[in-house]
Swiss-Prot record:
InterPro entries: CD99L2. One of its GO terms (biological process) is cell adhesion. It is a single-pass type I membrane protein. Plays a role in a late step of leukocyte extravasation helping cells to overcome the endothelial basement membrane. Acts at the same site as, but independently of, PECAM1. Homophilic adhesion molecule, but these interactions may not be required for cell aggregation. Glycans are attached at residue 129. It is found in: Cell membrane; Cell junction; Secreted. One of its GO terms (cellular component) is plasma membrane. This is CD99 antigen-like protein 2. It comes from Pongo abelii. The keyword Transmembrane applies.
Length: 218
């Protein structure tokens, strides 16, 4: 038991000696005072807040090192037009250029090259165009006449039907009038025939009575 206590005390003394030696002799060790200490070189954070605007970087197109690359600027240049890999001649060409467009827009007339035509399509270019147009005109006129004839026939038939219906109606009304007149005439004849018979019967009854007897004369 005593041996353990002595060993513990020896270790504790050795540890304290080591700590004291480090704190007194080694100045480069970590110290909390160094972290808290404020020096003149350290400035506040808000003093360093500054805004910097960077100039936008402009990207330039790389140089066209190869002549076969596609470039939109080449489409606007008439001098670099190619035909089957060969450059067209600048003068004496027979193509359609911007000059022709300027002439058309400016009010001038397009003047094509010799032997190439103006690109316009006329009636003389196609010999069958006149025949087709004439056939279409005849067909249109014939169809119009047929429609007019059909309309006239249908209107005439409807008119005749209406006329026939009205004639039947008038005939029926006239027949009814005749029947009414005939009935009235028969009634009048019956009345005329009945009155004389009544008078005759009255006279006949009077004549049938015997005459009164005369009294005897003295």
């Amino acid at each position: 038991m005593v041996a353990w206590r002595s060993a513990f005390l020896v270790c504790l003394a050795f540890s304290l000696a080591t700590l004291v030696q480090r704190g007194s002799g080694d100045f480069d060790d970590f110290n909390l005072k160094d972290a808290v200490k404020e020096t003149s070189s350290v400035k506040q954070r808000w003093n360093h807040v500054t805004t910097t605007t960077k100039r936008p970087v402009t990207t330039r197109a790389p140089a066209n090192t190869l002549g076969n690359d596609f470039d939109l600027a080449d489409a606007l240049d008439d001098r670099n037009d190619r035909d089957d890999g060969r450059r067209k001649p600048i003068a004496g060409g027979g193509g359609f250029s911007d000059k022709d467009l300027e002439d058309i827009v400016g009010g001038g007339e397009y003047k094509p090259d010799k032997g190439k035509g103006d690109g316009r399509y006329g009636s003389n270019d196609d010999p069958g165009s006149g025949m087709v147009a004439e056939t279409g005109t005849i067909a249109g006129v014939a169809s119009a006449l047929a429609m007019a004839l059909i309309g006239a026939v249908s209107s005439y038939i409807s008119y005749q039907q209406k006329k026939f219906c009205f004639s039947i109606q008038h005939a029926a009304e006239g027949q009814e009038g005749l029947n009414a007149d005939y009935v009235k005439g028969e009634n009048l004849e019956a009345v005329v025939c009945e009155e004389p018979q009544v008078k005759y019967s009255a006279l006949h009854t009077q004549s049938a009575e015997p005459p009164p007897s005369e009294p005897a004369r003295i």
